[in-house]
Amino acid sequence: MQSMKDAAASAKAGMEKAKASMQEKVDQMKTRDPNEKEMARERKEERQEDAELRKQEARHHNATAGHVGGGGIGGTGYTTAGYNIGDTGGYGGTGGHDNRGYPTAGSGYDTGRQDDLSSMGFGGDTEGAYGTTGNQDFPNAASNNAGTRRNTRGGTQDDPYYRSY
């Protein structure tokens, strides 16, 4: 399970790095100013470093997630609310977790890091959580735009993509 999560984190980081490279190329094509081209390169490098940092954080989180609970007598150490901080098994101490669920104490997590990712091009979604109210396709349980979805329940007369041959 951990290796699958690590592979997913690597794939996501790879996609973010590729996206940063493509955005740099677009920005460089749009301008002739060498300063703007240099700024585009710097933005790309910053985005790639941020993607690598998030990948490493996810790997660290995946490696410690199974050890955080520790469990007491007759317990697993896990609760429905997340981590059981009372019995940390040597991980995390009495610290909390950041907004993505990563431990902030004893993990080497940089608490001074800026998490303003609104300029990354993916809406600034830093929560990493999905709602469970029937709209799992949308980050943070954002309301879906029903007008852009294909309606297959109303029959063929309501389906704008239906073609009768």
From Swiss-Prot:
Question: Which Pfam families does UniProt cross-reference here?
Answer: LEA_1
The cross-references to InterPro entries, in alphabetical order and at most eight, read: LEA_1
Biased-composition ranges, Gly residues, are 67-76
Q: State the protein's name.
A: Late embryogenesis abundant protein D-113
Q: Give the organism the record lists.
A: Gossypium hirsutum
Q: Region Disordered: which residues? A: 1-76, 92-165
In the record, biological process GO terms are: embryo development ending in seed dormancy; response to abscisic acid; response to cold; response to salt stress; response to water deprivation
Q: What else is known?
A: This is a SET 5a protein.
Biased composition of type Basic and acidic residues is found at 14-60
Give the residues annotated as coiled coil. none
- Biased segments, Polar residues type: 132-155
Q: Which PANTHER family match?
A: LATE EMBRYOGENESIS ABUNDANT PROTEIN 6-RELATED, LATE EMBRYOGENESIS ABUNDANT PROTEIN D-113
Q: Which domain of life is it from?
A: Eukaryota
Relate the protein's function as given in its record: LEA proteins are late embryonic proteins abundant in higher plant seed embryos. There are two subsets of LEA proteins (5a and 5b), the first ones are expressed when the cotyledon weight reach 80 mg and the second set are expressed above 100 mg. The function of those proteins is not known.
Give the Low complexity compositional bias ranges.
1-13
Return the similarity comment.
Belongs to the LEA type 1 family.
